[in-house]
Amino acid sequence: MTHTTALRTALIAGVSFMTMAGAANAQTSAESEARIAALEAQLAALSGQIAELKAATAASPKDTRPAPGATTVTLSNGRPTIATSDGAFSASFRGFFQADAAIYDQRDAGPLSTDFRRGSFGDAAENERARDMSDGVNIRRARIGMEGKVFSVFDYNMVYDFGGSGVEEAGRVSSAWLQYSGYPVKVRVGFFPAPTSLEDASSFTGSLFVERASVAETVRGLAGGDGRASIGLTASGERWNLAATVTGNTVTTLTYDEQLGFVGRAAYVPFKGKDWMIHVGANANLIIDPAASGPDVALAGGAVTNVRLRDRPELRVDGARLIDTGNIDADGVTALGLELGGQIKNVYAQGEYFNIDVERRNSTLSDPKFDGWYVQAGWTLTGEPRRYNTATAGFDNPRPAKPFNPKKAQWGAVELAARYSTFDLNHLAGGPGNPTLPGAIRGGEQNIVSLGVNWYLNSVVMVSGAYRNVEVRRLSPGGTAFGAATPAAGAQVGQDLDIWSLRTQYVF
């Protein structure tokens, strides 16, 4: 009985244990299934969110900016440029090449004793060439350099030139300057041409003719011009431009006491429409203290401070100058100019008048006064207008709408050009055959009619052809002004001639 009871008790206990274990196992499986279901729901939700993010990313614009600190290299219009991605630093390589060819159509040359045509005073070589100006070719400009930006607010420019007038030169600094551009009024320091006139405001690669009008070029050389030591201020807006520059010597000039000059210019666009505009302006070019030609010895009346006005007949294949005042011992020079220009669609015109007043030094003679003016116009047959540059207040060349490509029947832009200029460097000159009066200056009067065609194949290549009719009326001062073979006082030493020229230009 005892054994039976014990067995029964053991069986009941075993069944109870198995029942309890099964219940526990059933409870654990249910919890696991619930957790798995929850995880699957979370994965499904995450998958949906990822799909939405992919769709949104595909629809948004791509950020193509270079990584911070990266540099970019471009070749816009053939000009290699390296710049940082933020534009704070840049370097652009510049190149300018202008080759001129010319034919001078003159009366046949005779001996100096009977052929009185002359060039500059006291220059035997020019007086020989004035009777037979040299047909040929000349590299007018061959410049290479760099320009760019430093720390966002500084601009710089360095250009070296190997061209010349009549003959090529060994090389010289054309410009080397640094400019702070962080304020509306920009400050520039270095060696650069101050803006002297409307004619000077056009870039030398975009002017209507290959050389500036004679009077504008001469005024430019007083206190401006390439490679002149300068410090200047400029400011401009959509319709106005102001510039003021204090200048010194040019880099190729060696004197005792250097020249001190001032150049100021103001320009304004009073009227402007959709495809037309009017420009007015005024300029002043002053030599405050001319450069000294020797030691400043007080007992001898001080150093001679000469100024000289002369120019070529608006072309430089031959370097001879047909009008020339000679040296004038001066205390200073004041040249004042007025500007007027305008544009209607693809037709443009501009003109300037200049008055030049020279103040003699230590002299009772009258102060000489000279003047000159020009007017010129251009018409682009292919329809592109000249571009008015508000930063310089000047007109630059048209940009071809269809660059030259014969395969596509594209021929670039073609522009017709015309100009009349006159420049009078006479003071108390008197008439032919008359003796030279005290204080008189027989520098001559030059009148030039120019007609031309400019062909802009693209934004970097241009070919320009022109014809000039040159008339120079000039009387000999007598004495030894032209050397041993100086014609008698009052003899005509001017001349008439025709000049044909062709320029090829490449600029990047």
Language-model features: where?
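Alpha-helical, heptad-rich or low-complexity scaffold/stalk segments
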Residues: 26-61
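Gram-negative bacterial Sec-dependent N-terminal signal peptides
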Residues: 1-25
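Short coil-to-helix leader/linker segments, especially the first N-terminal amphipathic alpha-helix
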Residues: 48-81, 393-396
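Outer membrane beta-barrel
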Residues: 77-290, 369-409, 413-431
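Acidic-residue sensor for enzyme active/binding pockets
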Residues: 40, 52, 147, 211, ...
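Short, solvent-exposed secondary-structure boundary motifs
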Residues: 63, 72, 135, 222-223, ...
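Outer-membrane beta-barrel pore domains
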Residues: 30, 72, 130-131, 284, ...
